[in-house]
């Protein structure tokens, strides 16, 4: 994994609502504001590490590839499919972002990439006329090494996601210049894992805010997450649900991410985890 060092720090839990769904998935509607009373009562020791180095976006280290996408026409993703594939090089410490109509599978080939699985992929969706960005991270599953460090991988991905989102906005800058309203789109982050504890979905709010660093240098402790009782499903309108039939307000008609989508199935079924 492209982690430089691991440190230990005392990290307070964040205020959040958690909702368990079927297929061993957890939906977390997270807030970045901290409960001062809770912070005084308990603290958690959790590992911290870096996936892409310091959590500071450096445009000079980002290489952008437009594959089958006309960079100058900056067509709206609500009319033409648009995805992001972001990978990291341990050798050069550079990020490579592919902007295309589907996930750039060639970017994910090779034994090293398959071993590390530190890529981040994302797609734009229009659901009932509202745009949202769906970001996917692979935490564990596939081989035992990832399972052994699933917790560490979860913290790393979550810590570095603001950098990833900034890379999307910077790399696809012409699109956002032409359609600045996309920065108000809701960001949904999917953490894929064979371990229920880390198999979860988080709502990060508007892209403009999600790309900003947290108020404090922290990550969400899983122990704190498990403390909050899962009492109800997301309220109507929170989870982006497609229209049941063919329509013009939902696009694309199917997901462009070739990963399991048990999170979406669970939310659509509206069934809490047993």
From Swiss-Prot:
* Function as written in the Swiss-Prot or TrEMBL entry: Involved in the disassembling mechanism of the intact light-harvesting complex of photosystem II (LHCPII) in the thylakoid membranes. Required to trigger chlorophyll degradation during natural and dark-induced leaf senescence.
Q: Where is the transit peptide?
A: 1-48
| Organism name | Oryza sativa subsp. indica (Rice)
Q: Which UniProt keywords apply?
A: Chloroplast, Plastid, Transit peptide
Q: Which GO terms describe its cellular component?
A: chloroplast
Q: What is its main location?
A: plastid
Q: What is the recorded name of this protein?
A: Protein STAY-GREEN, chloroplastic
Annotated Pfam families:
Staygreen
According to the lineage, what is the superkingdom?
A: Eukaryota
Per UniProt, subcellular location reads as: Plastid, Chloroplast
Give the family this protein belongs to, as stated in its UniProt record: Belongs to the staygreen family.
Q: Name one GO biological process term.
A: chlorophyll catabolic process
């Amino acid at each position: 994994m492209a982690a430089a060092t691991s440190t230990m720090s005392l990290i307070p839990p964040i205020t959040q609502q958690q909702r368990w769904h079927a297929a061993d998935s957890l939906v977390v509607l997270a807030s970045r504001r901290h409960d001062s009373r809770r912070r005084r009562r308990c603290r958690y020791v959790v590992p911290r590490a870096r996936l892409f180095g310091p959590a500071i976006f450096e445009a000079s280290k980002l290489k952008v590839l437009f594959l089958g996408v006309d960079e100058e026409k900056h067509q709206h993703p609500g009319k033409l499919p648009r995805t992001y594939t972001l990978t990291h090089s341990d050798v050069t410490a550079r990020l490579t972002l592919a902007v295309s109509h589907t996930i750039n599978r060639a970017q994910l080939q090779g034994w090293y990439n398959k071993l590390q699985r530190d890529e981040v992929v994302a797609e734009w969706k229009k659901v009932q006329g509202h745009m949202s960005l769906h970001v996917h991270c692979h935490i564990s599953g596939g081989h035992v090494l990832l399972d052994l460090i699933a917790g560490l991988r979860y913290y790393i991905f979550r810590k570095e996601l603001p950098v990833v989102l900034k890379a999307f906005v910077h790399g696809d800058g012409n699109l956002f210049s032409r359609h600045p309203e996309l920065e108000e789109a809701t960001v949904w982050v999917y953490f894929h894992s064979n371990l229920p504890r880390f198999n979860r979905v988080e709502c990060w709010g508007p892209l403009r805010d999600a790309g900003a660093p947290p108020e404090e240098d922290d990550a969400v402790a899983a122990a704190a997450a498990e403390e909050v009782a899962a009492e109800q499903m997301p309220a109507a309108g929170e989870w982006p649900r497609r229209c049941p039939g063919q329509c013009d307000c939902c696009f694309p008609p199917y997901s462009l991410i070739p990963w399991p989508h048990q999170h979406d199935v669970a939310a659509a079924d509206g069934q809490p985890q047993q």
